[in-house]
Curated annotation (Swiss-Prot):
This is Matrix protein 1. It comes from Influenza A virus (strain A/Duck/Hokkaido/8/1980 H3N8). Belongs to the influenza viruses Matrix protein M1 family. GO terms for cellular component: host cell nucleus; membrane; virion membrane. It holds the Pfam family Flu_M1. A motif (Nuclear localization signal) lies at residues 101-105. Gene3D superfamilies: 1.10.10.180, 1.20.91.10. Residues 1-164 are annotated as: Membrane-binding. The gene is M. GO terms for biological process: viral budding from plasma membrane. Plays critical roles in virus replication, from virus entry and uncoating to assembly and budding of the virus particle. M1 binding to ribonucleocapsids (RNPs) in nucleus seems to inhibit viral transcription. Interaction of viral NEP with M1-RNP is thought to promote nuclear export of the complex, which is targeted to the virion assembly site at the apical plasma membrane in polarized epithelial cells. Interactions with NA and HA may bring M1, a non-raft-associated protein, into lipid rafts. Forms a continuous shell on the inner side of the lipid bilayer in virion, where it binds the RNP.
Amino acid sequence: MSLLTEVETYVLSIVPSGPLKAEIAQRLEDVFAGKNTDLEALMEWLKTRPILSPLTKGILGFVFTLTVPSERGLQRRRFVQNALNGNGDPNNMDRAVKLYRKLKREITFHGAKEVALSYSTGALASCMGLIYNRMGTVTTEVAFGLVCATCEQIADSQHRSHRQMVTTTNPLIRHENRMVLASTTAKAMEQMAGSSEQAAEAMEVASQARQMVQAMRTIGTHPSSSAGLKDDLLENLQAYQKRMGVQMQRFK
């Protein structure tokens, strides 16, 4: 796997699923391929994106700045600086300085990533902030190692909390989670169906599912009533795709 492919993988792992993720993936691909060279416009676009946490925006801004060639005197962006200040905690800053000194001795992406993984997310963010604010310099490869270590830690904690939600025995949370998944699946079906005539059926199924979820939320239903809702929808979607000549082996 190439270095940039690895960086893209790690960075996208912390972006929530949805149309915005697809857009960010496209921007990263363009940047890494050297197709997007307007850092100013890129940062302005990133700053105004909804949903993303300040830290995720900070990490993306850092990656764009590392990759897109820019004039020497280009102003650093406040939204990135604020996200990469380790919550203003002096302990994070102290650790970030120690980490920075170690990173200066590293020359490879994997070496830097290994060193960085033993630090907290706050210290890692602060260290990125040091480099972003030009208080320190490391090679691009080492900086990418730092980025990927940070993303790995964030993705780990997201995965833990997601697993807790999925395996929770609380029926109300499971019920709500199934309804949310059914609703987003229905939304995806509507987007995929487009405007062809054969799509009317898929649109109808999706629309009914969303109305059903709305009704279930409005009147309050037994927690087990949502079981299988998303799977039913996915079966419908696969049947529709088969008729359209699209064969997707895995959608679950």
